[in-house]
C-alpha cells in the first residue's frame, strides 16, 4: 500500500467539494470533526458514521448496470445481451448519433449520465488564454478583448462536446452510481455501508479532480 500525501491545493479542492457532497447526501460534517482527520480513510469513516439510515446488502453499482442495460435495450441502441461491464463505450455510443442516444438513455433512466466531457487539455488551454487575455488588457486591449471572446466562445462550445469521458461501461457506472446513489437505489432511507467507501472515493475523485489511486491512500498531514 503506497501512502500519498495530498498537497495543499488538493486538500482545498476536497474542502470546496465537501459542501456539494453534504447537500447531495443530506449530511453535515462539523469543522471540529474534520480538523482531526489524518487521512482519506478516516474521512470516509466519518462520513459513513453520519448516515443513520438502514444498511442493507443491495449492490447499487450492479443495479445501476442492470438499469443501464435495460435502457439500451428499450431505446433500441444495442443488443443488451452482448454487453458487459468491460464493454468499450465507443461500441455502445459510436460517434454517429452519440449525443442523441445518450440523451435517450438519460431520459429513460431519469438522471444525467454526464458521459461526455471535453479534454482537460482543452479546458486548460481556454483557461490559460483567458488569463493571458485579461493581463493583456493593460497593453494591447483590442487583441485582449478578441482573446477573451475566443475563450468564452470556447467554454460555451465545450457544452456540445462529443468526447466520451470514460472508456468502459464499468467506469461510467462507477461515476453515475456515486453521483446518483439514492436515485439508483430508489430509496433515500438506506445505504450499503460495505460499498459506500467506494462511492465516496469515486465522488470526490470526480468532483475534486484527484486521481482515485492517490486519493484512496491520501494523507492530510
Question: What does each of the following model-derived ranges do?
Answer:
Residues 1-19, 23-221:
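Phosphopantetheine-dependent thiolation modules in NRPS/PKS and related acyl-activating systems
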